[in-house]
A protein has these predicted regions:
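Short hydrophobic/aromatic beta-strand element in the GNAT-like acyltransferase core
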Residues: 47, 112, 124
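Regulatory sensory and allosteric helical modules in signal-transduction proteins
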Residues: 53-103
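Sensory-domain boundary capping and coupling elements
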Residues: 116-129
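A short, aliphatic-rich beta-strand micro-motif
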Residues: 109-116
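Well-ordered alpha/beta subsegment
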Residues: 135-142, 152-153
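Short loop/turn motifs at secondary-structure junctions and domain boundaries
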Residues: 42, 103-107
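Intrinsically disordered, low-complexity terminal regulatory regions
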Residues: 1-62, 66, 145, 149-154
Length: 155
């Protein structure tokens, strides 16, 4: 079954991820499984993954999808803006976002949730879609809860 055919609720997705991260102590393994669950469960997306803070930039972490940009400066693009502003960025049309970084020209909308612990940005969760205005309030809330689950694990 392909990702667009799945009809999982946000509660189903959260439950699946919660079970995975509760059983694993390695953050890379947890991020890899979270990216896989989201990529398979969320319809109409073309990329799901993480960028991790390394010095003053975000570096590509575990993901599902096409080849991605490997380094993103803080404050640049949707991911860098989420890290700089320390808040979720939900962009309906990435082509109208100032400084958008087109890692995949097929992407039309994007949502990025920062990973923040004790006031420190550790990285971001990034989800892209080829559909304009793909992400809504319900998915934003769910993705923010996914990040909270990850941060409560042994991250």
């Amino acid at each position: 079954m392909s990702a667009p055919d799945l009809k999982l609720t946000p509660a189903d997705i959260l439950s699946s991820i919660e079970g995975l991260v509760a059983a694993e102590s390695d953050p890379i393994a947890n991020m890899a499984n979270i990216a896989a669950v989201l990529f398979e469960a969320l319809p109409r997306i073309n990329w799901a993954g993480f960028y991790l803070m390394r010095g003053n930039e975000l570096v590509l972490g575990p993901f599902q999808g096409r080849v991605a940009c490997t380094r993103i400066a803080i404050g640049r693009g949707v991911c860098g803006t989420a890290a700089a502003e320390r808040k979720t960025q939900r962009i309906d049309d990435v082509h109208s976002f100032p400084g958008h970084i087109a890692c995949d020209a097929a992407s039309a909308s994007e949502i990025v949730v920062p990973l923040i612990r004790d006031g420190v940005v550790l990285g971001v969760l990034d989800i892209d879609s080829p559909e304009t205005a793909r992400f809504g309030d319900e998915e934003q809330t769910m993705l923010e809860q996914v990040v909270a689950l990850l941060l409560r694990s042994r991250f």
